[in-house]
Amino acid sequence: MIDLTCSSFARATNVTWRTFDGNSILLHLESGVYYTLNPAGTLIWELLDRRIAGQDLLTVLRDRYSVEEEEARRDLVDLLEEFAREGLISIHEHEIKYR
């Protein structure tokens, strides 16, 4: 399971996409598979245009849709895990340093 507190995420370079009426269509250029995102998925996808911390994604999602943190966390982790399985994003783990 993805840990949002010590990971950051970015779009894979082999994916192209377009947005229509708030929804997005993604095309994985190597596999030729298309994916459709609803407006919430589109918001997350747009934020992945640069490497972004999982906690920052969670904050945006929670604030935009006024949902409880645990619900937003579950939905975000599910989406990011699906993106990762399909090769649509890269995940960067951060080492946690203790003093």
Residue ranges of predicted features:
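Acidic, low-complexity/disordered tracts enriched in E/D and polar residues
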Residues: 1-42, 46, 92-99
